[in-house]
A protein has these predicted regions:
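Extracytoplasmic
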Residues: 1-147, 170, 180, 192
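Active-site-proximal, structured, solvent-exposed surfaces of multi-pass membrane proteins
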Residues: 119-120, 124-254
């Protein structure tokens, strides 16, 4: 995830706090609600609440000392793409800075970023983003959000070991989840194990077949946990055996 933030010019430390200039992050990461403290003068939409600092947000109400804003272009977790760009093409785009959005961030709502050596794998699943579609604007971002929402999961549920999602898939396609890619994750589609792809500079995706109510399940297990548990059991068994042996060979008092 640090690689992702670095790639779009957002400083990454103990907590990630992208400025409102980076509005496209909110779309990519499926942000639905924003809570703005009504006790300070750092207004999200100005004192008269008429000019939201990010496009697509509308005032919803106030509760417990917070003004609540809804992202009307919210994309549910788990959505698909029609197009891709390679990591090299992504790196060639404008990065942006801490207080300015760049083309890289906007591009990820229009085309999924795949590693250069995976292009052949996606033949027949994704199309290469045409040059004519490589102009990125605020209005274009809003339309891209609507397009992604059109092909998003119908349900997404966290579990004790990860999450599950369902989608009505009209064709074989790749489904993106804004969950950091790391060792320990495994995935299954309709109960069958599938490979997890690293996409969008550090997030996860899987390819799903055509079908109604396709079920996607991600499970996380701490890497090395089973091995560590096994080593602990073996060590304990050796300790018990050693103590029993020492007890047998210890000379008895006369």
């Amino acid at each position: 995830i640090m690689e992702f933030y670095d790639s779009i010019g957002v400083p990454r430390d103990v907590g990630s706090r992208p400025t409102t200039d980076h509005y496209a992050i909110r779309g990519l990461l499926s942000v639905h609600w924003l809570f703005d403290d009504d006790h300070d003068d750092a207004y999200f939409a100005g004192e008269d609440m008429s000019d939201p600092a990010m496009p697509g947000f509308a005032y919803y109400g106030n509760a417990n000392g917070y003004d609540i804003w809804e992202n009307q272009y919210y994309i549910p977790m788990g959505f698909s793409y029609d197009y891709y760009i390679t990591r090299s093409e992504y790196n060639a785009l404008n990065e942006g800075s801490e207080n300015a959005i760049g083309d890289r961030e906007l591009a990820m709502l229009r085309a999924i970023v795949i590693e250069d050596d995976r292009v052949q794998y996606y033949e027949g699943i994704l199309e290469h983003l045409p040059e004519s579609m490589r102009s990125f604007t605020e209005n274009g971002y809003l339309q891209d959000c609507l397009d992604r929402r059109e092909r998003s999961c119908s349900s997404f549920t966290y579990t004790n070991t990860g999450f599950t999602a369902q989608i009505d898939s009209t064709q074989e396609q790749i489904i993106f989840f804004s969950v950091p890619y790391e060792a320990g994750w495994s995935a299954a589609v309709n109960g069958e194990p599938v490979a997890i792809e690293k996409v969008n500079v550090g997030f996860m995706a899987v390819v799903v077949p055509e079908g109604d109510s396709v079920t996607i399940e991600f499970t996380y297990r701490t890497p090395g946990l089973a091995l560590g548990f096994g080593i602990t059991l073996v060590s304990l068994a050796l300790l018990v055996a050693y103590l029993m042996l020492m007890n047998r060979v210890r000379p008895r008092p006369a």
